[in-house]
Amino acid sequence: MDVFGDEAFNVPDSTDWLGTPLACLMPVEQAFRCHVCKDFYDSPMLTSCNHTFCSLCIRRCLSVDSKCPLCRATDQESKLRGNWALREAVEAFKNSRKVLLEFARTPPTIQAILPDQAGPSSPSKRKATEMEGPKEEDPESKRPRRSTRSTRARAAELTAAILQEEQDTTPSADPDYVDQPPDDGLVACPICLTRMKEQQVDRHLDTSCPGSPQAASKRRPIPAQTPQPSTFPSFNTRLTSQTNQKPPERLPALAYSMLRDTALRKKLSELGLSTHGSRQLLEKRHKEWITLWNANCDSSRPKKRSELLRDLDEWERTVGNPGTAAGGGGGQQGLGLMARAQATGAQIKDKEFDGKAWATRYGGSFGDLIKQARQGIKRQTLDGNGEKADTKGGGGGEDVGPAELPTLQAREGESSAAPTRMDIVPPSSPPRPGQVDDADTEHDGQAPGKDAIAEDTAMREQVIPGTPDKERQWETSQQQQPPIPGDAQLSGMKKPNPETC
């Protein structure tokens, strides 16, 4: 495969001149290349520190840190000036580079000429003889010089004769010559033969016509010379064509910190740009569009708006939003979904939108979404009722470790709905009339037996669940309770001691 013949691999570089007779052109080409993009200058702009860069390159650099990429001096976009002379030089070098490089890479070919193939008066033979030169010097070596001088004299005489013949055969000297009026849109005055516009002939005859056709006929009218287009347009011609074209207006920069998201999206919409994405992406998109647009204003051949939009899209997919390109093309899919959703929204907002056809087409999808939403609500309701039932039932089913058992029992005792004995008869309040202790009433004023003591102990364990410290605290509070006066039956009875029984 011819690698050098493929344009994808044949990237022009200044090192292409190495190994050729024109290796001295390598620094010349390096001087014509930008220090940022390493390509030929495209609309070169001169900074305030006298450095030159491409218009797009320097504007991107200044939009980041407002400093020159070479000397790191502070600069602004408003101080950039176009270097048009360098632009003309770069264009001329780019147009002639391919031809010069092919000429430098082509080896010189010398054709050998045999004596019998050329006559004695052949100029190529004389040229070859002069290039080779005599090997031995002799007195007759000066003859070619005299013959050369005589040849030059004869050539000069022949040239003079040709010029004289041309002068003798001019149309003015030919009696049969008929003057043809030039096709320039003008007419000649019938008296003085002065050429002018047809509308000016009558006024010329009344005011400024000399009125002597003999004197006017003696001098030959000089036709108006129309400028002929040159195959090599000069700098002045290009400058005139540039000044005739009205340059596009530049876009001003925005203070993004002073704009809300709605205002920024409105600015992008006015410029015909996309409005989807985060706040950071919107700012970067607007800033890059301003850079592309203002750099295009500096170009001698501005691009179309469609080309600039294509460049912006390429920048956003490669540089502007690199996070979307990660993950094996997931970002591109996200951009596609976002663009599709945006197009769908615009379609729905259209006043000619067919709602019935849309409902018929996507009714099944909406029904599935509604069904899923209802099932989710029902599931959440059932889960909430189950949690409430578990809470009312004491949270059965949960495994509690031994270390958490005392704390859990104390919490259950505090929040239990069953009243305790202390809640029924507080220690500091006297009992109501006719109220008797359940244990004492059960034994009819007699000392309780072992069965009664066991039942009382079981009842205390049920009423006040918890640790032995909690039970001991309850017994102490019962012992410290003062006797109730006026109740002989209760005052005569003693509380049984479980240790003695």
From Swiss-Prot:
Its EC number is 2.3.2.27. Residues 111-154, 203-250, 377-501 are annotated as: Disordered. Keywords: DNA damage, DNA repair, DNA-binding, Metal-binding, Nucleus, Transferase, Ubl conjugation pathway, Zinc, Zinc-finger. It is found in: Nucleus. Residues 127-142 have a biased composition (Basic and acidic residues). A zinc finger (RING-type) spans 34-72. Residues 225-246 have a biased composition (Polar residues). It catalyses: S-ubiquitinyl-[E2 ubiquitin-conjugating enzyme]-L-cysteine + [acceptor protein]-L-lysine = [E2 ubiquitin-conjugating enzyme]-L-cysteine + N(6)-ubiquitinyl-[acceptor protein]-L-lysine. Pathway: Protein modification; protein ubiquitination. Belongs to the RAD18 family. This is Postreplication repair E3 ubiquitin-protein ligase rad18. The lineage of its organism: Eukaryota, Fungi, Dikarya, Ascomycota, Pezizomycotina. The gene is uvs-2.
